[in-house]
Amino acid sequence: VARANSANEQIVRSTMRVMIDELSVGKESPAGRWMGVNGLFDGQPADSVAFLTLGQFRGAESAKESELVRIVYTREGDLLLRFVRKNLYGLTDESIERVELARKVKGFNVRYYDGKTNLWLDEWNGAVRGVPKAMLLELMLQQENEELQTIRQWVTVGAP
């Protein structure tokens, strides 16, 4: 059981690293603002965050608006999901890719650091606030017959 839990934790940590990589190069654009929604499901955090980032992690210098993708991370039931819209101007669901990032999720909490007010916030409106300076992601998982496990990751957004 310990080996399986260790393997699960490694998978979750690598998933969180991908999320951190995408969030760290997040962009602000009229094509899509940062948006963070504070949610609950079964009394536990079920937040959602939507943002623009560079497709395939291209260098910031070469990024054109057409290379940006819209990403949404959200908890639905016991799943952590990632939605990607590669065509920002596409109107059909065909331009949306859905990926299951984690199972047995009991909570997904996102906090946003506003560098202008020096406050941590539970929700984010990019139309008013722009891009958050930093974020805290908390993913709570419950494996079979195990205690609730919380994995936390900090990320600086828009870092050079």
Q: Across the structure, where does each feature detected by a protein language model lie?
A:
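Residues that act as N-cap/strand-start positions at coil-to-secondary-structure junctions
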Residues: 67, 93-95, 149
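Extracytoplasmic beta-strand-rich oligomerization domains located immediately C-terminal to a leader/signal peptide
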Residues: 1-91
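A broad, low-specificity signal marking well-ordered, structured residues that form hydrophobic/aromatic
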Residues: 49-50, 99, 135
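Local beta-strand/beta-hairpin segments that build beta-sheet-rich folds
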Residues: 80, 97-106
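A short, polar/proline- and glycine-enriched secondary-structure boundary/capping micro-motif
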Residues: 61-62, 90-99, 121
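Short linear sequence signals and composition-biased patches located at protein termini or domain-edge surfaces
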Residues: 106-160
